[in-house]
């Protein structure tokens, strides 16, 4: 028994944890690239949860050689129109902000120039939440070992998933309350409509009865 326990103790980290890191880690980073014609505007929208760090890097390749006074304006806003980041004549840079509420955020690139100018190539890489954290810097500050850094990252990722499930549960409860409220209103409206129809039918019966009596068609 003692001979077999030694190698097992030296196996290292849990294979399941490493598998989660391999599956969830690389797939969480996504760069978007597109072509931006001159005098055009393209926007990207994304819903992001509350109190999350959002970081991004962008690079705009100008293939015109500076002809036509080509300039590109980058602006990031929330659904209320508040400007979170703005850059005139953007070429390459980074940005960061923290969300205050769950909201829809919009990243817009607008190109302005004159003449026939080739399309610009825009590359945008946005990260938020766990993806936006600089774990290399955290490791230096807290003097963490590589395995401890990966475990910290896995812990943050698990917390993020739990928060997502909690938000979805809250949304489900809100939708259920809305459905129940709607069903109650429909029921009350149906009852009101039924009484209106009964009242209208009763009025028509009495009206026709008086009409026929006036015409002496009935006694």
Swiss-Prot record:
Known InterPro entries for this protein? Answer: Emp24-like (IPR015720), GOLD_dom (IPR009038)
Which Pfam families does its entry note?
EMP24_GP25L
Q: Which residues lie on this side of the membrane: Cytoplasmic?
A: 207-219
**Domain comment text?**
The GOLD domain is required for proper p24 heterooligomeric complex formation and efficient transport of GPI-anchored proteins.
**Domain (GOLD): residue spans on this chain:** 41-193
Q: What is the annotated quaternary arrangement, including any partners? A: Predominantly dimeric and to a lesser extent monomeric in the ER. Monomer and dimer in ERGIC and cis-Golgi network. Forms homooligomer (via GOLD domain); the assembly is promoted by direct binding with leaderless cargos and may form a protein channel that facilitates cargo entry into the ERGIC. Forms heterooligomeric complexes with other members of the p24 family such as TMED2, TMED7 and TMED9.
Hydrolase: present as a keyword of the record?
no
Q: Which GO terms describe its biological process?
A: COPI-coated vesicle budding; cytosol to ERGIC protein transport; endoplasmic reticulum to Golgi vesicle-mediated transport; Golgi organization; intracellular protein transport; positive regulation of interleukin-1 production; positive regulation of protein secretion; protein localization to ERGIC
Q: Which residues are glycosylated?
A: 179
A molecular function annotated in GO for this UniProt entry is:
syntaxin binding
Q: How does it sit in the membrane?
A: Single-pass type I membrane protein
Source species: Bos taurus
Q: Which UniProt keywords apply?
A: Cell membrane, Cytoplasmic vesicle, Endoplasmic reticulum, ER-Golgi transport, Glycoprotein, Golgi apparatus, Membrane, Methylation, Protein transport, Signal, Transmembrane, Transmembrane helix, Transport
Q: Which PROSITE patterns match?
A: GOLD
Q: Which parts of the sequence lie on the Lumenal side of the lipid bilayer? A: 32-185
The subcellular localization recorded is: Endoplasmic reticulum membrane; Endoplasmic reticulum-Golgi intermediate compartment membrane; Golgi apparatus membrane; Golgi apparatus, cis-Golgi network membrane
Tell me the leader sequence span. Answer: 1-31
Which stretches of sequence are listed as region Interaction with ARF1 and IL1B? 207-219
Residue ranges of region Required for interaction with STX17? 1-142
Name this polypeptide is given: Transmembrane emp24 domain-containing protein 10
Function comment? Cargo receptor involved in protein vesicular trafficking and quality control in the endoplasmic reticulum (ER) and Golgi. The p24 protein family is a group of transmembrane proteins that bind coat protein complex I/COPI and coat protein complex II/COPII involved in vesicular trafficking between the membranes. Acts at the lumenal side for incorporation of secretory cargo molecules into transport vesicles and involved in vesicle coat formation at the cytoplasmic side.
Anything else of interest in the record? Ectopic expression of TMED10 alone does not result in its proper cis-Golgi network localization. Interaction of TMED10 with TMED2 is both necessary and sufficient for transport of the couple to the cis-Golgi network, and TMED3 and/or TMED9 contribute to facilitating the process.
Motif annotated as COPI vesicle coat-binding, chain positions = 211-219
């Amino acid at each position: 028994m003692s001979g077999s326990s030694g190698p097992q103790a030296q196996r290292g980290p849990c294979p399941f944890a490493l598998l989660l890191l391999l599956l969830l880690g690389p797939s969480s980073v996504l760069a978007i690239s597109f072509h931006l014609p001159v005098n055009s505007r393209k926007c990207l929208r994304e819903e992001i949860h509350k109190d999350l760090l959002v970081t991004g890097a962008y690079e705009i390749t100008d293939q015109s050689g500076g002809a036509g006074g080509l300039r590109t304006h980058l602006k990031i806003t929330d659904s209320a129109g508040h400007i979170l980041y703005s850059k005139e004549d953007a070429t390459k840079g980074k940005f960061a902000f923290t969300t205050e509420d769950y909201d829809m955020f919009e990243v817009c690139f607008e190109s302005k120039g004159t003449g026939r100018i080739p399309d610009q190539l825009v590359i945008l890489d946005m990260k938020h939440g766990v993806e936006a954290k600089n774990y290399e810097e955290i490791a230096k500050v807290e003097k963490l070992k590589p395995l401890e850094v990966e475990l910290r990252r896995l812990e943050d990722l698990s917390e993020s998933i739990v928060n997502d499930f909690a938000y979805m549960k809250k949304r489900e409860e809100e939708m259920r309350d809305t459905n129940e409220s709607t069903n109650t209103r429909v029921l009350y409206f149906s009852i009101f409509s039924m009484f209106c129809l009964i009242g209208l039918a009763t009025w028509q019966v009495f009206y026709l009865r008086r009409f026929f009596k006036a015409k002496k068609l009935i006694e």
